[in-house]
Regions:
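Short, flexible loop motifs at catalytic/binding sites
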Residues: 59
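A short, compositionally biased domain-edge/stem linker segment
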Residues: 1-4
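Bacterial carbohydrate/catabolite-sensing allosteric modules
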Residues: 6-53, 62-77, 82-156
Length: 156
């Protein structure tokens, strides 16, 4: 809760990577609008490079998440699929848990957090069914994504 000289309001933080990309920007816009309608002010903590490769550059970018003033944050939304590093995501969660801040995982799952996940398997099934029944295609090829990625495996 931010308490200033003239104002008092709830604050939500959103942690992600790649807000400069249309898809991530759209998700942040929808989430921010929903939080604002509930009376929150929204702070966005964004890095430009995902943390998949553990490089000095990505470590430097990950330091943006250390700037979160947990004294004024009332809820933290984390988008782990954009961050692409369990270590970075776990570090953010550990700091938020220590400050007793509720965490919403958007498109991810973690113990002790409120998890919002997408049904990637069912959505692909619906698209394939549509292509077969409506467009009469019978000889289909598709790529599910990166081998070993849980969402890619779910599509298969």
């Amino acid at each position: 809760m931010y308490i200033g000289k003239f104002h008092k309001y709830a604050v939500a933080g959103i942690c992600l990577v790649g807000m400069q990309n249309d898809h991530a920007a759209h998700i942040v816009k929808v989430a921010s609008d929903a939080l604002i309608k509930k009376g929150f002010k929204v702070m966005i903590f964004n890095a430009f490079t995902d943390m998949f490769y553990d490089t000095p550059y990505s470590k430097g970018e990950a330091s943006v998440y250390h700037l979160i003033n947990l004294d004024i944050i009332d809820v933290l939304v984390i988008m782990p699929e954009t961050i692409k590093s369990e270590w970075v995501t776990d570090t953010i969660i550990r700091y938020a848990n220590a400050a007793k801040i509720p965490i919403i995982m958007l498109d991810g799952s973690h113990n002790g957090c409120t998890n919002i996940t997408y049904d990637y398997g069912r959505s692909l099934e619906t698209v394939v069914e549509h292509v077969i029944t409506e467009h009469k295609c019978t000889d289909l090829f598709f790529m599910a994504g990166t081998k070993g990625n849980c969402f890619s495996e779910e599509r298969i």
